[in-house]
C-alpha cells in the first residue's frame, strides 16, 4: 500500500489507524510464492489483514474463495462518493463474477501492435488469425520473443479456446492447438535482441500510462501501426489492465467500516502519480483537457529513437481517441491462464527437444490440464 496514503489517512483520523503487514519485503527475504502461501494461510486461518492491495495477487482466485467483499454496496450506502464518478470500463474490468473487487487509483495499459498491412486495420484477433498473418507474411518474426514468452502471451487471454469453464473440461486435440505449436516452434529458447528483427516483427509490445507515450511508438515504427491487442478465443479487442494501489476489503475483516473509510479516503484524496491514467473520470478529463488546450505543441520532455532525441508534443485529438479506445477495452488477466500455461510449457519443452512425439505430448497436456481443472473445481 502507498505509505503516503496511509500517513495522510492516519493524520486525518481519530477513530481508525492503518498499518502495513508486508508479506514480502527486505526483512524476511521470502520469494513471491512463499509470501503468497503465507497470505493464503492467514486468509484460511482467520488471521488475515482487513484489506489487501491487489496489485500482484491472483484476484480471480481470491474471488473464487470468497475472501473479498463486493465494494458496490459500500458505494451505494455512502453519500460522499459515487461509483458513477469512475471510468466504466475500469470498474467493469475490476468486477469479477459480480464482485467489484477494487477501484484502482491508477493503472497502466499493456498491449501489442503491428503494421496495418500485416495484421489488419482493426483490433482483436484469435490464434487462427495469428497463424494466417504468419502465412501471409513469411518474412516476419516475433520481435525478440522466446518460445516461452510467446506461449504465455498467446494463452494469457485465449486459454478459453481450449477450456470450457462452465463444464470444467479442456480439449487440446484441435487444429487450433496444432497451429499454436507451429507458431511457437520456430522461436528461440533464449532471447537474442536484434533491432532489425524488431522492425520486421509481426507484433511488438506497447505500454501506455498517459496520453503522450503513444508518440514514441509512432516515431519508431510509423503512423500506420495498429494496436491489435491480446489474442483471445473470440477475437474481441482486449488490452491488459495493470492496476496500482488497488485496495480490497477482506470478507472476514472485523473492521470493514474502517477499511472502507481508508479506501474512500484514497479515492477522494487521490495522490497517485501525476500523469498516470486515473480511474476517476474528472481527473481523466482534466488530463485530456490539458492536452487538447495545447494540442500538437512541442514540449520540453523528450524520448529517444535510433535517429536521436525527439520532443513529445501535447496529444492531439486523434491520439487521445486511440488511447480512449484502448481504455474502453481493458481487462484483468484471467487467473488460471498462468497455471495452465506452465503445464503446457513443461510438456512442450520435452517435445521441442525431441523427447516425445506431438501426439504423446498433446495427450499428456490434455490429461494434466484436465486434472488441474478438476482440482480447482
Regions found by a protein language model. Name each.
Residues 92-194, 251-257, 357-360:
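Helix-loop-helix "hinge/cap" segment bordering the ligand-binding cleft or interdomain interface
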Residues 182-261, 271, 282:
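Extracytoplasmic/periplasmic substrate-binding proteins
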Residues 14-17, 46-50, 99, 137-141, ...:
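Loop/turn elements at helix/coil->beta-strand transitions in domains of secreted/extracellular proteins
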Residues 2-17, 344, 362:
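Short, polar/charged alpha-helical segment
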Residues 17-86, 220:
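Extracytoplasmic "Venus flytrap"/periplasmic binding protein-like
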